[in-house]
Amino acid sequence: DEYGKSDIGKNKTIIVEYSSPNIAKPFHIGHLRTTLIGKALYDIYKYLGYNTIGINHLGDYGTQFGKMIEGYKRWGQEYNIEDNPIEELTKIYVRINELCKSDESVLEDCRENFKKLEEGDKYCVELWKKFRDLSLKEFYRIYDLLDVKFDSLNGEAFYSDKTDEVIEILEKTGKLIESNGAKIIDLEDKKMPPCIICKSNGSTIYATRDLAAILCRARTYDFDKCLYV
């Protein structure tokens, strides 16, 4: 039982981020791959004496939730999301997405919903929590079968109120420039497209929240290494 055990990780902290499914969407083979590889790495590092932190960085925020909220407002009573959350929420998302393609005003309503969610609108927040809780219930049915556990479920939403500092740091260091009302980082010297940090309507994107996550984790865990699986 002790074969391969070591203390080479003594007094060192490592973060392993794995699984990270999207709320209100199916848990697919890609999520299964990162879940199993991440669990293996988590167990190995723990066996080597590291203070190992397993994080499930849930995809629980973003403009898609503006669409989910709009779809639920329009047709929620037609779907049984309580008994079959992922399948029914997916149907709502597909339906509202199709409508957005043909009607720009609906897409604008969805964007406004997400803006309200960011600002803490009670109705939007309550719906978001409902989608998240129902999705997690389904995800944990799978995690329990695989004997997978996490130390943190802090996803994108957790960092949504921590992005102002990221923007402030980037502005102070001269890395942000304005483009068509949005705030971006120019990555032309890296031969990459620009990275949007703040949209013209003031909303943040995944990259903004990911930077906030890195900053928060560094302060919380003072980690030596962070693995993204």
Please identify what each model-predicted range represents.
Residues 1-229:
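NTP-dependent nucleotidyl-transfer catalytic core
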